[in-house]
Swiss-Prot record:
Its EC number is 2.1.1.197. It comes from Salmonella typhimurium (strain LT2 / SGSC1412 / ATCC 700720). PANTHER family: METHYLTRANSFERASE (PTHR43591). Converts the free carboxyl group of a malonyl-thioester to its methyl ester by transfer of a methyl group from S-adenosyl-L-methionine (SAM). It allows to synthesize pimeloyl-ACP via the fatty acid synthetic pathway. Keywords: Biotin biosynthesis, Methyltransferase, S-adenosyl-L-methionine, Transferase. It is an enzyme of class 2 (transferase). GO terms for molecular function: carboxyl-O-methyltransferase activity; malonyl-CoA methyltransferase activity; methyltransferase activity; S-adenosylmethionine-dependent methyltransferase activity. One of its GO terms (biological process) is biotin biosynthetic process. This is Malonyl-[acyl-carrier protein] O-methyltransferase. HAMAP family: BioC. It comes from the Bacteria.
Length: 251
């Protein structure tokens, strides 16, 4: 797995904090999909790991759960606090949660663990802080995500402008030894042009590359090349994500 610079990731998401919600349709769709795997279940205490501006922290709070919101980015956590999304707030890393073991009934993490250095370590931490009989519920992105972005940039400079995500088999391997249910789903978002599609990534802070550079500055000439190379369908510009959902039952 590529070396992960947590400080750079936190900075990228911090810059996106103020406009995150208006670009977060993927996060909303993936959260809704994960919720369907928890239908009918209630949780007295919830950890929202990678809470962002707190949309799902607020969701669980409004359903009577005592919520702890955790994020690596201080501006994101401040957004959640300003919205009174949770009861408690933790500026922390999912791979090193500063909490006792067996505290929460649900550890919820929506599209955050793909930013961790080691998926098994991240899931092990979430598992550690959940009580026996509790649940770890998470989503992440897997290999094959953002093919349109990759195809368009390939026509320009043949360099990686998106992070590589783990194949399904590697995520399954990270779940070994636990009682887990998993499901995969493709999600496609549609945009009016290629620039809007790329802005959606920047708007959620997802422009940091693990290789250590931010996405290159777009010139008009480059943008024209990308626009022409982007695969279109009925005049729209798709951006496809391969979503992996996992639910781990804590023994």
């Amino acid at each position: 797995m590529a070396q992960v610079n947590k400080q750079a990731i936190a900075a990228a998401f911090g810059r996106a904090a103020s406009q995150y919600e208006q670009h977060a349709s993927l996060q909303q769709h993936s959260a809704d999909a994960l919720l369907t795997l928890l239908t009918g279940r209630q949780f007295a205490s919830v950890l929202d790991a990678g809470c962002g501006p707190g949309r799902m922290s607020r969701y669980w709070r409004e359903r009577g759960s005592e919520v702890t919101a955790l994020d690596l980015s201080l501006p994101m956590l401040q957004q959640a606090r300003d919205r009174q999304a949770a009861h408690h707030y933790l500026l922390a890393d999912i791979e090193a949660i500063p909490h006792d073991a067996e505290v929460f009934d649900l550890a919820w993490s929506n599209l955050a663990v793909q930013w961790c250095g080691d998926l098994r370590d991240a899931l092990s931490e979430l598992y550690r802080v959940v009580r026996p009989g509790g649940v770890v519920a998470f989503t992440t992105l897997c290999q094959g995500s953002l093919p349109e972005l990759r195809q368009a940039w390939q026509a320009v400079d043949n360099r990686a402008h998106a992070n590589s995500f783990l194949p399904e088999e590697a995520i399954d391997h990270a779940l070994r030894g636990w009682r887990a249910f998993r499901h995969t789903q493709a999600m496609t978002l549609w945009f009016e042009d290629a620039l809007s599609a790329m802005r959606s990534l920047k708007g959620i802070g997802a422009t940091h590359l693990h290789e250590g550079r931010e996405s290159d500055v777009l010139t008009r000439a480059r943008l024209r090349q990308i626009q022409l190379a982007w695969p279109q369908r009925q005049g729209k510009y798709p951006l496809t994500y391969h979503l992996f959902m996992g639910v781990i039952e804590r023994d």
